[in-house]
Amino acid sequence: MIIHSLLDTDLYKFTMMQAVLHQHPAAQVDYRFKCRTPGVDLAQFVDEISREIDALCRLRLREDEVDYLRSLRFIKPDFADFLALFHLDRKYLSLTASATHPGEIELTIRGPWLHTILFEVPLLAIINEVWFRNTSEPDFEEGRSRLREKVASLRSMPAGCKIADYGTRRRYSRQWHGELLPLLRDGLGEQFVGTSNVYFAKQYGLTPLGTMAHEYLQAFQALGPRLRDSQVAALESWAREYRGDLGIALSDVVGLDAFLRDFDLYFCKLFDGMRHDSGDPFEWGERVIAHLEAHRVDPRTKVLVFSDGLNIDKVMRLYQHFHTRCRLAFGVGTSLTNDLGPTPLQIVIKMVRCNGQPVAKLSDSPGKSMCEDIGYLRYLRDVFGLPPMAEG
């Protein structure tokens, strides 16, 4: 069994789930899986993946796990009570080998947002681990050697250059993830600030980290009062739920231009910072700093969180470029948890519909957008004043 606990997921799944429970408990959603890595035959492992999903759906939170969640300042008592009764239901998930694309799998999740939101991260971890344990021999000594080099590189930087682990969804294996976190904790000291993984945060006494993901803002394209106001509605909903806590806003759901138009003086003051997850990080940081300054907000009081495909070299370059001008945080994923030699898979599970309507992410990076309805993508770009899609 790959997943042993429902806590073996990213914190932001629980923080979003709490907001869904309180504000949109009846919302219905569709998610779809996509493998962006060409030539990967996952279909041969569909039965093995299915058995792991069955095991996942038998899990419930133990009393000590619920108590741990209760201990987090932003988890409310009614949500903890709800989680004590919660389990993932297999009826909301469909998994088959693709009938039209040999080697591919068709994985869809459809059901109440409240009851399906926790599927994504463990499913991706399952697919990764099934793939790698069947197609490669792990060289853990090579992984440890690479990890020591990364620790040494970071230790050569000023103490303010700090990282967090964001690598659950694309890790090589649960075992490797569990081994490397104490190595980072002990090797980096205060330069390692925590992990997005709630299970390992509990196990190793680390700080669990995370706020919101793209799906939260995407859903408001269907839940909000009108499409043009969907980002504002999502951010205001978040502020109602957390009253200033967990104040990192995700900036690339409909591209940075549209985000900055919506992120007015109120949001600049209310939120603690913004997270970069696509596009050029240096250009993004410069534009965010300029935006804050234009609203008479001192960037040195705000946090810029970088989390898009980071490695230690990029962390160091970003730190050197920005550290005197703002506060910084770096979430490193695949480069930490899946760097043992074999090529990591580029796999995602994205929300594609909410309440029967298409929703989409207009990423600042080509190829990261995902939507089933091309007409809706064109409409979304038009509503937010973005250039038309390239035809062809």
UniProtKB/Swiss-Prot annotation:
One of its GO terms (molecular function) is nicotinate phosphoribosyltransferase activity. Gene3D superfamilies: nicotinate phosphoribosyltransferase. Its EC number is 6.3.4.21. Pathway: Cofactor biosynthesis; NAD(+) biosynthesis; nicotinate D-ribonucleotide from nicotinate: step 1/1. The keyword Glycoprotein does not apply. Keywords: Ligase, Phosphoprotein, Pyridine nucleotide biosynthesis. It is an enzyme of class 6 (ligase). Belongs to the NAPRTase family. InterPro entries: N/Namide_PRibTrfase, NAPRTase_N, Nic_PRibTrfase, Nic_PRibTrfase-Fam, Nicotinate_pribotase-like_C. It comes from the Bacteria. Pfam families: NAPRTase, NAPRTase_N. One of its GO terms (cellular component) is cytosol. Transiently phosphorylated on a His residue during the reaction cycle. Phosphorylation strongly increases the affinity for substrates and increases the rate of nicotinate D-ribonucleotide production. Dephosphorylation regenerates the low-affinity form of the enzyme, leading to product release. Signal peptide: none annotated. This is Nicotinate phosphoribosyltransferase. The keyword Ligase applies. The modification Phosphohistidine is found at H214. GO terms for biological process: NAD biosynthetic process via the salvage pathway. The gene is pncB. The lineage of its organism: Bacteria, Pseudomonadati, Pseudomonadota, Gammaproteobacteria, Lysobacterales. It catalyses: nicotinate + 5-phospho-alpha-D-ribose 1-diphosphate + ATP + H2O = nicotinate beta-D-ribonucleotide + ADP + phosphate + diphosphate.
